[in-house]
Amino acid sequence: MNHLVIISVFLSSVLLLYRGESGITSSFIRSEWPAVDIPLDHHVFKVPKGYNAPQQVHITQGDYDGKAVIISWVTPDEPGSSQVHYGAVQGKYEFVAQGTYHNYTFYKYKSGFIHHCLVSDLEHDTKYYYKIESGESSREFWFVTPPHVHPDASYKFGIIGDMGQTFNSLSTLEHYMESGAQAVLFLGDLSYADRYQYNDVGVRWDSWGRFVERSTAYQPWLWSAGNHEVDYMPYMGEVTPFRNYLQRYTTPYLASKSSSPLWYAVRRASAHIIVLSSYSPFVKYTPQWHWLSEELTRVDREKTPWLIVLMHVPIYNSNEAHFMEGESMRAAFEEWFVQHKVDVIFAGHVHAYERSYRISNVRYNVSSGDRYPVPDKSAPVYITVGDGGNQEGLAGRFTEPQPDYSAFREASYGHSTLDIKNRTHAIYHWNRNDDGKKVATDEFVLHNQYWGKNIRRRKLKKHYIRSVVGGWIAT
């Protein structure tokens, strides 16, 4: 009986993705913390003990297929060592990787020494322990590599955007760390340090690095840049876009033949993840346009059935904040997204949560005389997760009436998870930060655009279908 109920819920979820059912505008109002940054003397920004001890440790994927990581950290007083000692047994570091370091200035702020170290030739699905040393100070962490790239490799991603460093941000981070997710897809707008001036800009980049280290040192965060990473401040003499961000946060862009760290792609487990830059040129014949055109042809849905795109500015958004800002990128890329049957597109920027049905504006519904998005079974689901908790507060004013394409929307802080079960199904949750409790507010079953088609489902043997669906039900 329980299995029948679960199957019924699953089928209802699938139908809702395709039918233009009336969406939900949540009336929930929570008592959030004030939208102000946490004071610098708070324990969440605590500097590690020991002279010149490594801090702001974070890792990201270091290659195309998940057999490498890039480990980054800062030593505040002097360079120290750029080596990472690592191994598969705690306390036994049989391997050593050599990194590099640099520092930079921003106005009169001078950064610490920023280290980046590529650790490669790792085994899949293995827990590694690593140690970073600086003189007599050392710190130890661990991470787990993803499974082999395989169509049925299960994997759970967290999705966070527009985070900042307020008490609401802390609530989001703490809730996320209880989710069991294995890596973060970050949708841009990290520290919000650009809301400060002069030397405080760099100081708040440092504090944010220490703030998120409790997660970023132990699992990869896949970065994308937002408008608050641009840091264009000509009144301070700083006119190089993304200067702070690019000095501190590196990406494996060369592995996907990108010419810029701001747009790139990786394969992880059963997912092919494409990261785009909303604040770099993307119109026809630009480097980003050419790269995306080529990268989409490299996607092999037989190996990585889940095609996920990250960007900062949402293409579809019914909030009054940043309304229609994503229209230029929609015009440039939406036809490709539909053609290649992208499963889901995540964005941030709008400080609220919203999920769409599968819709597109590739072919206008001209029968009504309006150019308006229409249901499209080949289109992605668009999800805005710009509710990480930053000091600008929530965007609480949605357009009325709710558009037909909008399935669910709410102005609350939170994070999402995408739990990929196999090549055909994934379970999605949006978790609201509800007064210190983890609450799953919006959830549905996402079926894969490639393997969900009948012609390809027939390629799967009947016993395989029973095993993967039965396994999903059992969980």
UniProtKB/Swiss-Prot annotation:
Summary of activators and inhibitors of this protein: Activated by Mg(2+), Co(2+), Mn(2+) and Ba(2+). Inhibited by Fe(2+), Cu(2+), Zn(2+), NaF, molybdate, arsenate, vanadate and inorganic phosphate. No effect of tartrate, Asp, Gln, glutathione, Asn, ascorbic acid and phosphite.
Query: What is this enzyme's catalytic activity, as reactions?
Result: a phosphate monoester + H2O = an alcohol + phosphate; 2 a phenolic donor + H2O2 = 2 a phenolic radical donor + 2 H2O
Family recorded in the similarity comment: Belongs to the metallophosphoesterase superfamily. Purple acid phosphatase family.
Q: Which InterPro entries match?
A: Calcineurin-like_PHP_ApaH, Metallo-depent_PP-like, MPP_PAP, PPA-like, Purple_acid_Pase-like_N, Purple_acid_Pase_N, Purple_acid_PPase_C_dom
Pfam family name, one: Metallophos
Q: What cellular component terms from Gene Ontology apply here?
A: plant-type vacuole; plastid; secretory vesicle; vacuole
SUPFAM superfamilies under this entry? Answer: Metallo-dependent phosphatases (SSF56300), Purple acid phosphatase, N-terminal domain (SSF49363)
Question: What does the note under cofactor report?
Answer: Binds 1 Fe cation per subunit. Binds 1 zinc ion per subunit.
Species: Arabidopsis thaliana
Under the heading PANTHER family, the entry gives:
ACID PHOSPHATASE RELATED, BIFUNCTIONAL PURPLE ACID PHOSPHATASE 26
Tissue-level expression reads:
Expressed in roots, stems, leaves, flowers and siliques.
- Active site located where? H322 (proton donor)
Q: Does the keyword Electron transport apply?
A: no
State the protein's name. Bifunctional purple acid phosphatase 26
Q: Which UniProt keywords apply?
A: Glycoprotein, Hydrogen peroxide, Hydrolase, Iron, Metal-binding, Oxidoreductase, Peroxidase, Signal, Vacuole, Zinc
User: Can you tell me which residues bind Fe cation?
Assistant: D162, D189, Y192, H351
Activity at various pH: Optimum pH is 5.6 for the phosphatase activity and 8.8 for the peroxidase activity.
Cofactor(s) it depends on: Fe cation; Zn(2+)
Q: What is its EC number?
A: 3.1.3.2, 1.11.1.7
Q: Where is carbohydrate linked to this protein?
A: N103, N365, N422
On modification after translation, the UniProt record reads: Glycosylated.
Q: Per the UniProt entry, what is one GO biological process?
A: phosphate ion homeostasis
The record's subcellular locations are: Vacuole
UniProt: substrate binding residues: N227, H349, V350, H351
The protein's GO terms of the molecular function aspect are:
acid phosphatase activity; lactoperoxidase activity; metal ion binding
